[in-house]
């Protein structure tokens, strides 16, 4: 019975700051695993550690343009959100995935400088 209930509880995907704040507000003990996508064994290890040590765990997927020397490299960065989500949804007890847009991360910033 517990197994069936655990399968029915799925991770929630959050797409903006407003929903992120509203969703996380009730929780005090939250583990956070930031990524630029390309979910791999290292990420999965960090996520599992967070799940063990925190009441709730959130993974972010955000390709940060500030981490690239030029816009061309940023535009060529291989992003595959569907693949990342298919990997993440297999991780039991992962609560949330946050996939912000540029303006959610860099609010009030007129220009990004490297």
Which residues are covered by each model-predicted region?
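Nucleotidyltransferase catalytic core that binds NTPs
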Residues: 2-114
